[in-house]
Amino acid sequence: HGTIESRTVRLVVDFIEDFAIELPTLDDLTRISRVSARSLQIAFRRELGCTPSEYVRRVRLNRARAELLTPQPGTTTVSDVASTWGFYNPGRFAMLYRNQFGEQPSQTLARALGT
């Protein structure tokens, strides 16, 4: 059963990586994997040590960081990048970002801009 579980997780991970900009929900993930939310959560915990939702959040944060590290001078803002990746509460985005990367998103952007 581990190999089916592994294949299911791989399928869902690939989907998340390909469609992260569309902010996939747990319903989307269960639909493409054809397993229940509970089964998917168990498989993710076993294979990756996190839930599908946590994995989606991690991917979205990584994509936001990539944008902050390669800004368009004068046009890239932390709030625009955050909302692009589905983070609509600036304080929550800053907290999640700091927890994952050890710095504020504004620090990442300032460093990338050389300011």
Report residues per predicted region:
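Alpha-helical DNA-contacting segments of helix-turn-helix folds
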Residues: 16, 23, 43, 47-63, ...
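A general, composition-driven signal for non-globular sequence regions
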Residues: 32-35, 54, 59, 86, ...
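Short alpha-helical elements of helix-turn-helix
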Residues: 6-10, 58-62, 66, 90
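C-terminal intrinsically disordered extensions
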Residues: 7-9, 112-115
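Sequence-specific DNA-binding recognition helix
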Residues: 38, 44, 71-109
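DNA-binding recognition helix and immediately preceding turn/loop
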Residues: 2-51, 73-84
